[in-house]
Amino acid sequence: MSGADPASHAVRIRGIYTTALTRLFLDAGWMVVDASEPIRRRFDTEFDATAPTISAETTADRQGVGVQGTPTAVDEAAALLSVGIDTLSWEDAAPVGSVIDGKITDTRRRGALVDLGTETGYLPFRNTDDHVDVGEMVRVQVRESAAPWTDDRPLLDTDIRVSTGLATLLPESGTPTVSTRDAAAARELVGMTELLGVEAPDGWRIQWEHAATEASMDVLKSALNRAVVQADTLAGVLDDAPPAADRTEPTGLFAERAGRWFWFGRESRFVLDGLRRSVTTTLPGHHRIKTGADAASAGVDLAEALCGSDWSGETSDEDGIDTFPFSVVADCFGPSVGDQVDIGHGKPDGRLISLGSGTVTDRDDDSVTLQRELSGGGSYDALDIPRKNGDIAVTTFREGRWWYPTVYRRDDDVLGTYVNICTPVECFPDSVRYVDLHVDVIKHGDGRVERVDDDELEAAVDAENVHEALAEKARSVASALETAL
């Protein structure tokens, strides 16, 4: 933590967590900028039209949020956004705006894969004027970042630009433009640009963002000044750097921003529900339901609009298990018996691995049972039994529980039971999702109970992928299961 005044930071927030996070940041003394109309209606406060020091946007899968901005602001936001015991976060290895000399490792039909040193990015052929081949070095900039748990890759471009939130400098000549649908506001802003007394450097053109149409002259001047300084700094770095073609390995050249990704687990979503409930009508499990599906999200909005202030918003237990209507949600949106449901196995390092899909064989008020027929090859982890074609795995996931059992069977024989300790399980319509906490408890076919992989949990703590409170919870759950089994 830098100890900077929170009021010196401004955040732009978008996505399903916006109301909750607006409450969170305002309570911490931050400025919230470029607020949407629903947010302006819900909060009795003035929202400044100034350049954000960070943006916080919900990921496309609604699993969490990505934060991009100045390193100091990102660090301070990280402390705020760790809202629950099952919030996990990871540094963005390739923040938006980073300039890197990368190596082409593969070409696809419409683009190329580029080794950035820290991860692999994707360069669409439309984003480069030059033909690229495997093995070549290319200078690229990160346009869009990607959460570590998704299959997406950072989106790259060979055009290098700079941006300060309100003002972007493009590497081309021309008059200023405004990225807005409000033609009158755009004309006014273009006219005001000449009065700022700040000119774009040679070879750069000004493009204002829509939020700039509501900003004061002082704010516009400050944003443009910072963009000019950033462009001059970047130009100096690139002038001093050898051509990308002269390098043999990926090399980072420029990064004004930092980034961080936040995975919200089930308990964290209920904390966010509470923040949102302090502002407006919020059903139990609001964020949990919205994460599941588009149709479910629309259903929540409708229910809250119909209930309005008549909804008390009271919850009867700490984590919301008693008040979250899982069976009602599952009846409406799934999963149902016969459905195929994927097992989304999150890892503490940020990856999300599919363990395959299973058929729903049973579903009650709080749990889903999946059955998978397995193929032969290898052995069952920790059971030391060869895997054969036709073996059956039966897994029961209870919504909100910190563990789940998988029973492995061959014909009528039980080979063993593998109990995975994880963050509270969420049973969505198409997938079950959680983060594996490494330590597991095994019950062998002969009745012997064994606890495994404590060392992997310790390694995750040492790597700062799992915080100590979460690790201690995992150990406690494992100890209780050892006794119970």
Describe the residue ranges of each PLM region.
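Long, continuous compositionally biased terminal/linker segments
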Residues: 2, 39-86
